[in-house]
A protein has these predicted regions:
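Terminal targeting signals and extreme-terminal segments of soluble enzymes
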Residues: 1-74, 80-140
Length: 140
């Protein structure tokens, strides 16, 4: 069982557009980062948000369709699993019902002072999964 999906609206700006007239592929990864961080900031306790930072470890992206200037785009992300300091997300970027990109990503939680990996506590995991954390976290 995954966490509840989280939707994040995206506005396509002129600086997102490349020489081909559509959103540059690299911008999609920025949108994923914006979405994952917004998810964390919305659901995590304030003290966790203040004391933790996130870095991307891995992205696997499949591009389906281009996005264009002024498109109304939504990124929907699902936290699939927490393993120690790592979190695994699946994100789908859409324009209406049309899938523009699908992204699987792995993130590492860091202590914002030491910049060392910081395990996600079971209590914090429960705020995302809404069930006993042991059901969706591992010690890895």
């Amino acid at each position: 069982m995954s966490a509840k999906p989280f939707s994040h609206p995206i506005t396509v700006h002129p600086e997102d557009i490349d020489f081909m007239g559509h959103v540059n592929n690299a911008r999609y990864l920025g949108w994923v980062q914006d979405t994952v961080l917004a998810h964390w900031q919305k659901l995590a306790p304030a003290e966790e948000v203040a004391s933790k930072a996130w870095v991307a470890l891995k992205h696997e992206i499949t591009y389906r369709r281009p996005a264009f200037l002024h498109d109304a785009v939504i990124a929907e992300t699902v936290l699939e699993k927490i393993a120690g300091a790592r979190s695994f997300y699946n994100t789908v970027i859409r324009r209406g019902e049309e899938v523009l990109a699908e992204v699987q990503s792995m993130w590492c939680c860091l202590d914002s002072e030491t910049h060392r990996p910081a395990r996600i506590s079971k209590a914090v995991a429960e705020t995302f999964f809404g069930l006993p954390a042991k059901a969706k976290t591992t010690g890895a």
